[in-house]
Swiss-Prot record:
Natural source organism: Zea mays (Maize)
Annotated gene: KNOX6
Keyword Transport: no
DNA-binding interval(s): 22-85
GO (cellular component) term, any one: nucleus
Pfam families assigned to the protein according to its UniProt record, in alphabetical order: ELK (PF03789), Homeobox_KN (PF05920)
UniProt keyword terms in alphabetical order: DNA-binding, Homeobox, Nucleus
Cysteines paired by S-S bonds: none
Name of the protein described by the UniProt record: Homeobox protein knotted-1-like 6
ELK domain segment(s): 1-21
MF annotations from Gene Ontology: DNA binding
Length: 85
C-alpha cells in the first residue's frame, strides 16, 4: 500500500529522470555512417584538416548534422589525432 502510494507520488519525477539519463547516454557518439563521412574527409585532407565554409556546408548536407556539430567534431579530431609536424 505505502509502496504504491510512493510510486504514484513520484512517478512523474522518475519518468523525467529516466528520460534525462537516456538523453545523456545518447550524447557523444555520432552514427557510424555520419562518422565515416567525416573521417573520409579527414583522411583526404590529413595534411591540413581545416575545412572551408563550403566544405562544411557540404558536410552538413551529407551528414544531416548541424554546423556546430561539424565544427566541434573537427576541433576534437585535431586535438586528439593531428600533429602538424
Amino acid at each position: 500500500e505505502l509502496k504504491n502510494e510512493l510510486k504514484q507520488g513520484y512517478k512523474e519525477k522518475l519518468v523525467d529522470i529516466r528520460e534525462e539519463i537516456m538523453r545523456k547516454r545518447r550524447a557523444g557518439k555520432l552514427p557510424g555512417d555520419t562518422a565515416s563521412v567525416l573521417k573520409a574527409w579527414w583522411q583526404a585532407h590529413s595534411k591540413w584538416p581545416y575545412p572551408t565554409e563550403d566544405d562544411k556546408a557540404r558536410l552538413v548536407q551529407e551528414t544531416g548534422l548541424q554546423l556546430k556539430q561539424i565544427n566541434n567534431w573537427f576541433i576534437n579530431q585535431r586535438k586528439r589525432n593531428w600533429h602538424s609536424n
